[in-house]
């Protein structure tokens, strides 16, 4: 949801990746990024 909902890019910075990373951090993961519209958290 975070990747599709916030698919915005400003000066090369993807806002959706920041939202995805925050989502993953909230789940006690080490961050994450969007891959083909899906938020993928790092372990």
UniProtKB/Swiss-Prot annotation:
Tissue expression notes: Hemolymph.
Disulfide bonds: 3-34, 20-39, 24-41
Transmembrane regions: none
One GO CC term, this protein: extracellular space
Protein name: Holotricin-1
Domain of life: Eukaryota
The keyword RNA-binding is annotated on this UniProt entry: no
Subcellular location as annotated: Secreted
Family recorded in the similarity comment: Belongs to the invertebrate defensin family. Type 1 subfamily.
Lineage, top ranks: Eukaryota, Metazoa, Ecdysozoa, Arthropoda, Hexapoda
GO biological process, one term: humoral immune response
Alphabetic keyword roster: Antibiotic, Antimicrobial, Defensin, Disulfide bond, Immunity, Innate immunity, Secreted
Keyword Lyase (UniProt): no
Database matches in Pfam families: Defensin_2 (PF01097)
Protein task: Shows potent antibacterial activity against Gram-positive bacteria.
Alphabetized PROSITE patterns for the sequence: INVERT_DEFENSINS
InterPro entries xrefs: Defensin_insect, Defensin_invertebrate/fungal, Scorpion_toxin-like, Scorpion_toxin-like_sf
Gene3D superfamilies for this protein: Knottin, scorpion toxin-like
């Amino acid at each position: 949801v975070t990747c599709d909902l916030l698919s915005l890019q400003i000066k090369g910075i993807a806002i959706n990746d920041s939202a995805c990373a925050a989502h993953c951090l909230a789940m006690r993961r080490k961050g994450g990024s969007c891959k083909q519209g899906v938020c993928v958290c790092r372990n």
